[in-house]
UniProtKB/Swiss-Prot annotation:
Pathway per the UniProt entry: Amino-sugar metabolism; 1,6-anhydro-N-acetylmuramate degradation; Amino-sugar metabolism; N-acetylmuramate degradation; Cell wall biogenesis; peptidoglycan recycling
Active site: 83 (proton donor), 114
Keyword Nucleotide-binding: no
Highest taxon, organism lineage: Bacteria
Function of the protein: Specifically catalyzes the cleavage of the D-lactyl ether substituent of MurNAc 6-phosphate, producing GlcNAc 6-phosphate and D-lactate. Together with AnmK, is also required for the utilization of anhydro-N-acetylmuramic acid (anhMurNAc) either imported from the medium or derived from its own cell wall murein, and thus plays a role in cell wall recycling.
Domain SIS: 55-218
Membrane-crossing residue ranges in chain numbering: none
Gene: murQ
Single GO MF annotation: carbohydrate derivative binding
Note, other: A lyase-type mechanism (elimination/hydration) is suggested for the cleavage of the lactyl ether bond of MurNAc 6-phosphate, with the formation of an alpha,beta-unsaturated aldehyde intermediate with (E)-stereochemistry, followed by the syn addition of water to give product.
Descriptive protein name: N-acetylmuramic acid 6-phosphate etherase
Subunit structure, interactors included: Homodimer.
Organism the protein comes from: Escherichia coli O1:K1 / APEC
């Protein structure tokens, strides 16, 4: 697909004179365009759901979720991956973000990195990609060689693959087994795909990782019951989670958390089933870490 024919490279009539308007009007134009992004994502919800189910199946069998992208797309993958361990208590490395150009590229532009097909393949080889893993290629344009080559290599290994782009019929979409293509239209600043396209990608990644964690028992109701308390704010959040899940008071919640080394799931089962920490942990282990299943046990 030629660059000039891509939707993400088109000219947006709504912002054609954005350099001549007031600051407030400038913000309104950008905001009006941003409002269209959730609707574009809504149109591809079935594709997102299908990807979540595949990701969950593979991760449940011992695989990993691997994000692969360049520039903004790569940074968004790293952002999503880095939030999973503290939010959901998963081991670092279960969700991985790879960016063309390596760690330096997180904060700096690396010339030619996104054009390196070899880079996409080598980065996957360096993390010992296996057929059990899922590779999610992220590229607003859908034409990034680094991502396309990575997806091709992943499919050769037998991996399940997902392609996220904002141009229908792109190479990323056709290379991946599952295509997620929120079409957000031309950007306010022509070709600046960090804007609407980047926002759409972030919304999709939010759903992929959150959906995986919900289906993996990391959420009870709408509570992040595997959160790791790495600071005072999260210590307080743990107490509130146990309170909200059980109806107990703050003192009871804190006592249960202390008794089980600050594991929210265990504390919740302790309170609701009147068990000690060891009994509650055993009960959870017997039910794959799912609180709801543990509570249904006679």
């Amino acid at each position: 697909m030629q660059l000039e024919k891509m939707i993400t490279e088109g000219s947006n009539a709504a912002s054609a004179e954005i350099d001549r308007v007031s600051t407030l009007e400038m913000c309104r134009i950008i905001n009006d365009e941003d409002k269209t992004v959730p609707l574009a994502v809504e149109r591809v919800l079935p594709d997102i759901a299908a990807a979540i189910d595949v990701i969950h199946t593979q991760v449940s069998g011992g695989g990993r979720l691997i994000y692969l992208g360049a520039g903004t797309s790569g940074r968004l993958g790293i952002l999503d991956a880095s939030e999973c361990p503290p939010t959901y208590g998963v081991k670092p490395g279960l969700v991985v973000g790879l960016i063309a150009g390596g760690e330096y590229a997180i904060q700096h532009a690396v010339e030619g990195a996104e054009d390196s097909r070899e880079g996409g393949v080598n980065d996957l080889k360096n993390i010992n990609l296996t057929a059990q893993d899922v590779v999610v290629g992220i590229a607003a344009s859908g034409r990034t060689p680094y991502v396309i080559a990575g997806l091709e290599y992943a499919r050769q290994l037998g991996c399940r693959t997902v392609g996220i782009s904002c141009n229908p019929g792109s190479a990323v979409s056709s290379t991946a087994e599952f295509a997620i293509t929120p079409v957000v239209g031309a950007e306010v600043v022509t070709g600046s795909s960090r804007m609407k396209a980047g926002t759409a990608q972030k919304l999709v990644l939010n759903m992929l990782s959150t959906g995986l964690m919900i289906k993996s028992g990391k959420v009870f109701g709408n509570l992040m019951v595997d959160v790791v308390a790495t600071n005072e704010k999260l210590h307080v959040r743990q107490v509130n989670i146990v309170k909200n899940a059980t109806g107990c008071n703050a003192e009871q919640a804190e006592a249960a958390l202390i008794a089980c080394e600050r594991n929210c799931k265990t504390a919740i089962v302790m309170v609701l089933k009147n068990l000690d920490a060891d009994e509650a942990k055993k009960c959870l282990d017997q039910h794959g870490g799912f609180i709801r299943k543990a509570l249904e046990k006679e």
